[in-house]
Amino acid sequence: GTINSGGIIGPVGGVKEKLEAASRLGLDTVLVAKGTASPPDDKDFSEVNASGLNASELNASEQFINLTQYAKENLSLAVIEVSDLDEVMLYLTGAQLNHKEVIIEENQEYTEIMSSLQNLLCQRIDKIESELKKEGISVNESVLQRVREQQGKSVNATLQGDHYSAASYCFTANIMLRSFYYQEKKPSLNTLWNRFSKLEQDVEALDNDISKEPIETISDLQTYIIVKERLNDVREQIAKFKKLQQDPEQKFYEILSYAEERYFSAQAWMKFFSMNGKKLLLDKEHLQQSCRQKISEAEERQQYVSLYISEFDAQNIKERIDGAIDADKKGEYELCLIKAIQAKGDANAILSVMGVRKDVLVEVLDSKILAVKRVIAENSAEGKFPILGYSYYRYATSLKEEESYTALVYLEYAMEMSDLSLYFPEEKTFLQRISERIFITEDMWWGFVVGAAGSLILSQIFLRRKKKK
């Protein structure tokens, strides 16, 4: 099998031939990727058949041969399905490397700030609905139903303590209402120009504000990345509006609605600059290195994916990489980082499900969730709580049942965003900096301090005795 992100074992072609080769070499046990040794159940057969394959194609497809039975009866081989590298190591060595239960302790500051951010976005639904009522606009049943569905999802997420997902659902509802508002009001093209111009000014002002924020911790860096990405997104919507002069005005309303709510979201995320954390060396040099490293990793994945899917289908990944390269050239390394991470995540998501049957996808997701949890837990324990990585992780778990592929994409983003501290060393303490300059170790420095303190104590004792005499 292939080794995918998070140590997940993915399927490969020619498994039957590989088993036969293993038998000729005298092996008695072979490990294969989960879902490649046994055929799907009847339900999955019907689902695949509904996709357009005829019966002869189904029967000829290797993935529907019971390879476990075939290997046992014809090759005297035991075939064992594995999900990840931990299972592989267990079978090879008998050692359970990651047997401990993974528990993430949610950072209390994160919870408080994200809860506040959620309230801002969710209360905005009521605000927009009030605006509609003042204008005498009645929301039609179709839009209202979709808004209430998003609100319902938000309430459920809140009950589970998942404030990021709750905020995301409210954000979607806000766009729906705002778009309906503009469709009913039908503002003129001149009015639209004025709104976009005002939005453009607001974006530049907020961008100037975040450039003054000190970036000292992983939470600072991820907050900067989040706000920067949203502002860049708004800029893209403004550019799109300027290009689409011949399109129906309804398209303009949708673009404006999304851009305004995206900008509001960027403002809300500024709250996270107040969060504490372990200080790291987040200078331009290290940011540039991490940006270019991620671009390289994303390009590698994109080239690999392009071997299996069309150039058109891989276009989105290529566009993200181009965006990262462009940001790198402009010295916007934080924006470069998020775009490269998204490109790599999109490619990894495709590679993770390539050749995976639908009935096995749930197990792939579970394995990926566990891998992400481990990374988040390890970084959190070191005082480097990854606010965006954790947020994506919670959002992915909320999407798992209904939108499994989207959930997988967000898990890939979470994996990358949760381990950013790997690229940034911890900021050196005062003692470490002094020690480097005078060529003594920290232990020697402390020895000097303890020795000096001891000498001071002894001198005090000596003076007291002398006074008594």
Describe the function of each predicted region.
Residues Y182, N190-S296, E300-F312, E319-D322:
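Long, low-complexity or tandemly repetitive, helically biased scaffold regions used
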Residues V155-Q183, K242-S274, I325-S352, E403-Y423:
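Charged, amphipathic alpha-helical scaffolding segments
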Residues M114-S130, L281-E300, G355-L370:
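Short, charge-rich, low-complexity alpha-helical interaction segments
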Residues R148-G152, F171-F180, S219-K243, I317-A324, ...:
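Long, amphipathic, charge-rich alpha-helical segments that form helical bundles/coiled-coils
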Residues G1-V155, S165-A167, L199-N232, Q302, ...:
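Peripheral, non-AAA+ core regions of ATP-driven protein-machinery
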Residues I434-V450:
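Juxtamembrane/start-of-transmembrane alpha-helix segments at the extracytoplasmic/lumenal side
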